[in-house]
Amino acid sequence: MSAQLQHVSVLLTEAVDALAIKPEGIYVDGTFGRGGHSRAVLARLGAGGRLIAFDRDPAAIAAGQAIADPRLELVHAPFSEFAVVLDRLGVSAVDGVLLDLGVSSPQLDDASRGMSFRFDAPLDMRMDTSRGRTVAEWLAEASVAEITEVIRDYGEERFAYAIAKAIAAARTGGAIATTGQLAAIVEKAVRTREPGQHPATRSFQALRIFINQELEELTTVLPDCVARLSEGGRLVVISFHSLEDRIVKRFLRDEARPPQLPSRLPVRAADLPPPRLQLVGKAQRPGEAEVAANPRARSAVMRVAERCGVAA
């Protein structure tokens, strides 16, 4: 891997520690990336352990082929297919799941992926380049209302409507085909600037999240993870922006909350099912040293939960 396309795993030791790995256990890395977390998990597994690693990016799967370890099973699929893949592999329960969300450094730093406004490249943004629409294809057909909704909801951008109108006006003169074109359009439409942040940051984030259905993927996989965890198994999730973390925080909180007693019904608390999860510690963020060494770690938040008793 070239130096430019290296990926530094965030909260590496903390995340693997949080999995509380059993040497002969079965674990899932939902986002293989360049294998930083997976390698650390493999280092703690015994000869009978097993790691199933997902990634929807063909480049990540190709990079993973360099790991010659029979305990590792690489799966080219989004983690929303977690349950289907485990069924296919004959795995009914796992001892831990790690989800390192968001976009990887190689995806951002490879100009050909079209995810960053730092390069003028084809406007793609797909994590899985083998299927689905590119951002350029979607922008060519989307209405002003649809573009506004995506940029507002997924980018939390207050100038979403102005940006959407500018995109619609610009495409009348020809397709918006490159990241440079889009960044210039957004830059002109944003009337005020946030210190230290490019005007197109929120819009690019929004379009990437939307085109890859990142939040829908997350909402799908979380309950599937809990359903497959064995008793005492850990779910470890690292989020990188508030939209992701909000979903994770709410899900874990709800799963760890005891069920409410129905009002006016003769039901005892002992008759209700226990919560499926128990929260483990508080949300954890990278320390100053890690952020200094890897500035992209600054927004990371790690949350951990453990599976409570599983009914026979």
Swiss-Prot record:
S-adenosyl-L-methionine binds at G35, G36, H37, D55, F79, D100, Q107. One of its GO terms (biological process) is rRNA base methylation. GO terms for cellular component: cytoplasm. The keyword Cytoplasm applies. Belongs to the methyltransferase superfamily. RsmH family. Specifically methylates the N4 position of cytidine in position 1402 (C1402) of 16S rRNA. This is Ribosomal RNA small subunit methyltransferase H. It comes from Azoarcus sp. (strain BH72). The gene is rsmH.
